């Protein structure tokens, strides 16, 4: 609007000729001049404002340009990193392709080699199966030969065993037949062809089976009640009565021991058990008089003088034979092992030590069976030339 007014005033002044201006008065010229100056000043102010606005806009655009430059630089850096990453991934892809091709070639080669080896192994298996069949046939033939030899040997052994049994029946008189599986050793005077001698020789040839049988026998000793194994087989009446009286005395002592254990401390029991050994208790169990008269059958009886001086409650019995003494010691050890004490203490035997003691008891039984061959007096107390040992 000011530009339009200024332009209109300029046109007015420019169109007015000099003659007309000269005709104007001073007042009109002064008004015209002031009016033009005001218009000029307003135009100058407006122009200045416009320049400020332009400068402000330029500053904003410059800031925007700088920000865009920074963003562009970042994007260029990211683009460069992505290019490098793409190159790296492409290299890895190429390497993976090469590696996969190499693995494929290796797999084909290994598969062909495995097929060849499988074929070779199948051929070897066929050869081994053929050899196994031939060995089976050879083993069957050898078994048949062994069975034939066993039959021939059993035939010869049965004839010799009949002769040996006849000689034993004549020697022992009215003694009962011998139980081969009673756990004791066989007689050393038996014939070489008898079944007992053949069985003993068979055990020597197979020590592993003999050891396993001995362990089974020693473990079975604890499973049998004491009254089944306390009396040996074939003893005469005097020895049997003596053993029964010993059993009654053992029961009485066990009852006394239980009463003492109820009224005493564990320390006193431990000292008492340390002080008494199995053989010492057996010697205190049945003290026998020393003055006894021998009998013809190997047993003895108590004289009236000594029997009258026996303590009260003691029943006079016959003297125990030597074989019975050893047998009772063995039975005493077995009973001590079988007895389960309610209170455990430090002196208890371990399972290994118990097995060793049982094995020693079995050896004593075998020794007693062998000792009867050299002592006729003991033979009279035995039936079948043996004791009945632990089963």
From Swiss-Prot:
Pfam families for the chain: CCDC85 (PF10226)
Main location: other
Biased composition (Polar residues): 157-175, 280-303
Compartments where located: Cell junction, Tight junction; Cell junction, Adherens junction
GO annotation, cellular component aspect: adherens junction; bicellular tight junction
Matches recorded under InterPro entries: CCDC85
Entry keyword annotation includes Coiled coil: yes
Name by which UniProt lists this protein: Coiled-coil domain-containing protein 85C
């Amino acid at each position: 609007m000011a530009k339009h007014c200024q332009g209109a005033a300029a046109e007015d002044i420019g169109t007015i000729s000099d003659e007309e201006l000269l005709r104007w008065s001073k007042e009109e010229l002064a008004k015209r001049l002031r009016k033009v100056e005001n218009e000029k000043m307003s135009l100058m102010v407006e122009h200045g404002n416009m320049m400020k606005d332009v400068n402000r806009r330029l500053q904003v655009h410059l800031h925007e340009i700088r920000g865009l430059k920074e963003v562009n630089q970042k994007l260029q850096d990211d683009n460069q990193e992505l290019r490098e990453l793409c190159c790296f991934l492409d290299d890895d892809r190429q390497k993976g392709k090469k590696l996969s091709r190499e693995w494929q070639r290796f797999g084909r080669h290994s598969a062909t080699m495995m097929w060849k080896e499988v074929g070779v192994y199948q051929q070897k298996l066929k050869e081994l199966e053929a050899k196994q069949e031939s060995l089976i046939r050879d083993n069957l033939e050898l078994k048949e030969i062994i069975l034939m030899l066993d039959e021939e040997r059993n035939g010869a052994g049965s004839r010799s065993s009949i002769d040996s049994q006849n000689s034993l029946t004549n020697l022992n008189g009215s003694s009962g037949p011998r139980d081969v599986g009673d756990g004791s050793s066989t007689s050393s005077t038996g014939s070489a062809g008898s079944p007992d001698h053949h069985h003993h020789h068979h055990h020597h040839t197979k020590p592993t089976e003999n050891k396993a049988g001995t362990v089974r026998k020693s473990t079975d000793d604890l499973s049998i009640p004491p009254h089944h194994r306390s009396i040996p087989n074939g003893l005469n009446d005097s020895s049997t009565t003596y053993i029964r009286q010993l059993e009654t005395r053992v029961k009485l002592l066990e009852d006394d021991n239980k009463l003492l254990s109820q009224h005493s401390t564990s320390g006193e029991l431990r000292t008492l058990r340390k002080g008494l050994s199995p053989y010492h208790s057996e010697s205190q169990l049945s003290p026998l008089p020393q003055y006894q008269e021998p009998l013809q059958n190997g047993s003895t009886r108590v004289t009236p003088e000594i029997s009258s001086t026996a303590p009260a409650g003691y029943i006079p019995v016959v003297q125990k034979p030597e074989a019975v003494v050893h047998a009772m010691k063995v039975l005493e050890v077995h009973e001590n092992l079988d007895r389960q004490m309610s209170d455990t203490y430090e002196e208890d035997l371990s399972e290994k030590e118990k097995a060793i003691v049982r094995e020693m008891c079995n050896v004593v039984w075998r020794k007693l069976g062998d000792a009867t061959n050299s002592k006729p007096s003991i033979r009279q107390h035995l039936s079948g030339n043996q004791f009945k040992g632990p089963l």
